[in-house]
């Protein structure tokens, strides 16, 4: 796995909070956000932001935001009724890795990033939310191209 360390600017988002096991909570969250954004003609990149470590937090308590990047300053009027709010991916130093997911196995690349790739490049997580940026749509095939992002600091 190749990791790049880059400084990212803050990215405004429309987000919908989900809670529970990631494999069960993210799909319905994305469906809801996609339906809402389609009604408003919104376009952007799809992301998931992860706030909890599944090695440390019980599955039912895991929190994530499904997100759509936006340049809009205003949340459409029905956003809050759908549980959608404005948010942001914080700017700062990130470790980025482009990975391919097969059979919807999202855990394996994350484990490799945290257990092998980050220690090897001399950086450690900085405590902020990690993210996935979806570069392809694998809903039908289980095959995904993703960018994984972890806020980091030098060891």
Curated annotation (Swiss-Prot):
Q: Has UniProt tagged this entry with the keyword Cytoplasm?
A: yes
Under SMART domains, the record lists: AraC_E_bind
Keyword field: Cytoplasm, Stress response
Pfam annotation, one family = GyrI-like
Cellular compartment(s): Cytoplasm
- UniProt-listed Gene3D superfamilies: Regulatory factor, effector binding domain
Per the record, its GO cellular-component terms are: cytoplasm
Cross-referenced InterPro entries? AraC_E-bd (IPR010499), DNA_gyrase_inhibitor (IPR050908), DNA_gyrase_inhibitor_GyrI (IPR024911), GyrI-like (IPR029442), Reg_factor_effector_dom_sf (IPR011256)
Any one GO molecular-function label of the UniProt entry: DNA topoisomerase type II (double strand cut, ATP-hydrolyzing) inhibitor activity
Q: How does it assemble?
A: Interacts with DNA gyrase.
State what this protein does: Inhibits the supercoiling activity of DNA gyrase. Acts by inhibiting DNA gyrase at an early step, prior to (or at the step of) binding of DNA by the gyrase. It protects cells against toxins that target DNA gyrase, by inhibiting activity of these toxins and reducing the formation of lethal double-strand breaks in the cell.
Family, as annotated:
Belongs to the DNA gyrase inhibitor family.
User: In its UniProt entry, what is this protein called?
Assistant: DNA gyrase inhibitor
The species this protein belongs to is Edwardsiella ictaluri (strain 93-146)
Q: Which gene encodes it?
A: sbmC
């Amino acid at each position: 796995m190749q990791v790049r360390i880059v400084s990212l600017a803050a990215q405004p988002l429309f987000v919908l909070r989900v809670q529970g096991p990631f494999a069960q909570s993210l799909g319905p969250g994305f469906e809801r956000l996609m339906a809402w954004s389609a009604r408003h003609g919104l376009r952007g990149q799809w992301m998931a932001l992860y706030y909890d470590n599944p090695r440390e937090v019980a599955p039912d308590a895991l929190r994530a935001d499904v997100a759509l990047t936006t340049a809009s300053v205003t949340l459409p009027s029905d956003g809050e009724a759908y549980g959608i709010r404005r948010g942001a991916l914080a700017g700062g130093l990130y470790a980025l890795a482009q990975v391919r997911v097969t059979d919807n196995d999202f855990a394996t690349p994350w484990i490799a990033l945290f257990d092998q790739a980050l220690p090897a490049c001399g950086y450690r997580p900085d405590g902020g939310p990690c993210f996935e940026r979806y570069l392809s749509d694998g809903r039908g095939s289980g095959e995904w191209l993703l960018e994984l992002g972890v806020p980091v600091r030098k060891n």
